[in-house]
Amino acid sequence: MATVTTHASASIFRPCTSKPRFLTGSSGRLNRDLSFTSIGSSAKTSSFKVEAKKGEWLPGLASPDYLTGSLAGDNGFDPLGLAEDPENLKWFVQAELVNGRWAMLGVAGMLLPEVFTKIGIINVPEWYDAGKEQYFASSSTLFVIEFILFHYVEIRRWQDIKNPGSVNQDPIFKQYSLPKGEVGYPGGIFNPLNFAPTQEAKEKELANGRLAMLAFLGFVVQHNVTGKGPFENLLQHLSDPWHNTIVQTFN
C-alpha cells in the first residue's frame, strides 16, 4: 500500500505575495514537486519539476525564433508564420491592439443597451436593428463620411507605426500635441486617468481585447442562429437550463 504526498512551495498557498507570470511579464515559473512514499522500512522519494516559460502557448512546444516573449501577450502562437517579417509584426501588434479596443466597445454596445431596455431604464432597438433606425442623414451618406474619416485616422496611425512620434503634433490646431510615448499608447487626452502603460496593464488589455473579439463573433453567430440578442438568449437558457441549450438550438 502506498500514499501519495504532494509538496508545494509556500508561495502557492499565499497568492497575495506573488503575481502570475502572465500579469507581471516576468519569466516566472511554476514548480510542483510530487513525492511518492512507500510505507515500510525503507522509504523512496522521487520528484519532478514542471516549468511554464514565457512565450510557450503550449508547454513543451518551442516558440518561433522571432517571438521571444518580450511583447505583451506574446505566447509564441503563430502557426501560419504571419509575424516572421519584422515589419508585418509591427503592424499586427498594433492591429490586434486597436481591434481589441474596438471589440470591447462593440461588445459593451451590443450587450448593455439590451440589458437596460429589458429592465426598463431605456428603450432602444437591439444591436442588429440599430441600422434600420432613421438618423439625421441617410445610411449611405454616413458610410461615406465614416469611410473618409477613418481613412484619415488609419493613415496617420500607419505613419506613427513607421515613424513613432511623427504625428503627435495636431496638423490643424498647432497648439495641441501629444506627449512622447510608446506606439499604441498615446497618452494625453487619450489617457484622462493617467494610467501608466505597464506590462501588467498591457497584458490585461490584450487578454480582454482577445476575449471581446471572440465574444463579438459569438454574438453575431448567436443572433444568426436564434434571431435574438445575447441577454435574451441568456434569460431563455436560465429559465430552463436543461432544455434551452445549444444542443436543442441546433436540433
Swiss-Prot record:
Pfam families: Chloroa_b-bind. This is Chlorophyll a-b binding protein 4, chloroplastic. Keywords: Chlorophyll, Chloroplast, Chromophore, Magnesium, Membrane, Metal-binding, Phosphoprotein, Photosynthesis, Photosystem I, Plastid, Thylakoid, Transit peptide, Transmembrane, Transmembrane helix. The N-terminus of the protein extends into the stroma where it is involved with adhesion of granal membranes and post-translational modifications; both are believed to mediate the distribution of excitation energy between photosystems I and II. Chlorophyll b 1 binds at residue 57. The keyword Plastid applies. Chlorophyll a 3 binds at residue 205. It comes from Arabidopsis thaliana. Signal peptide: none annotated. Chlorophyll a 1 binds at residues 77, 96, 210. The chain crosses the membrane at residues 102-122, 135-155. InterPro entries: Chloro_AB-bd_pln, Chloroa_b-bind. Chlorophyll b 2 binds at residues 101, 144. Chlorophyll b 3 binds at residues 138, 154. The LHC complex consists of chlorophyll a-b binding proteins. Red-emitting heterodimer with LHCA1. GO terms for molecular function: chlorophyll binding; metal ion binding; mRNA binding; protein domain specific binding.
